[in-house]
Amino acid sequence: MSLIKSCQTQKFEELLVRKGNAEMRIKLGVRSTKVLQILVGVLMRCWVFAGLTILACILVYWTYGKLFAFLLLCLAIIGIFYHIEDNLLFHPDMPAHSRIFVPVPSMFGMPYESVNVRSSDGTLIHLFFIRQPGPLAIRVPTVLFLHGNAGNMGHRLQNVLGLYQNLQCNVLMLEYRGYGLSQGNPTEAGLCMDAKIALDYLASRSDINHKEIIVFGRSLGGAVAIDLASQLEYAQKIWCLILENTFTSIPEMAKVLIGWRLLHYLPLFVYKNKFLSLNKIGHVTVPTLFVSGLADNLVPPRMMSELHQKCGSNNKQLLQFEVGTHNETWTSPGYYHSLATFLRDARVRRGIDPPSSPPPPSFNESV
């Protein structure tokens, strides 16, 4: 009998090992595919420079030998990746026509203003301001919504409808430079600049409650939001910060997505866009809610935990949703109720009176 059990145990262990090996092969295959896609994308965008580099390496190899040719190749690869990092990080053309057609809030029954402002470097930036009806607008919070790295702000309108209805708030949607109908080209410095002008725009309006401005950032937008809230001049204008499925830094994300051991040894100056959120989050002191989808297959949920742990706010909370994916955590049951609860508690802790109009009696989580 014991011999039979021993055989069964051995077979079970063998199955586990096979399963583990299969999963490892799948992961390695996926990672190799991602790396190959990146390399092909680089060559397609820089084929002239890549061709000249190969020719130069051949000439150097003939003239000076292998070592100098190898060094030249390494420098060329670093240079190529540095100059096309914007194309690897920012995807304003996904899906197609995202720079031409931007869905508008009225398609979801929300009244809005289409606003154009100039960023501090003169770049024209497009905004949607979605306002609660009548005098209610000045008594409720206003959310500055910072979206992720692909598409345009119109692609987030269903989520914004949920915020508008369930949190009973105004919403200012920012279209980064180079996205949608905004001018310019996206860069780390440019996006952070655009967020500042959007917050300044809210501060200039006389028809909203300046004491309850919430900055919401998802994914790349979370990194922009952290930069904004980490600076005292702008933190003074922010009541609460909500971060969803964002990352600790671009170098750390590169290690996760590409998986090359070499990336662990590269100096920071190699990265054109850094978004060093983990270094900045310690300077964030406003009430901060970290919303993490545990089914996120792009940004590891541990990064949200690291940001939460290092955050400098005395009022911070990590909210985790088991079924939350990278872009769709907002569809998780209880999502809006949890956000509303955090804001209510923040209001109580600061002694702020609630809006005179009562909140909706129930939350429409299907929105």
Segments the model singles out, each with a brief description of its role:
Residues Y176, I242-E252, V270-L276, G324:
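Active-site nucleophile loop of the alpha/beta-hydrolase fold
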Residues N159, S277, V286, P300-Q309, ...:
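Short alpha-helix in the alpha/beta-hydrolase fold that links the catalytic acid
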Residues H283-T285, F290-S292, D296:
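Short beta-strand/loop motif that positions the catalytic acidic residue
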Residues S2, C7, K11, F68-R118:
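An N-terminal hydrophobic leader/cap segment in hydrolases
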Residues S120-Y201:
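Membrane-embedded segments
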Residues A295-V299, H326-E328:
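Acidic catalytic loop of the alpha/beta-hydrolase fold
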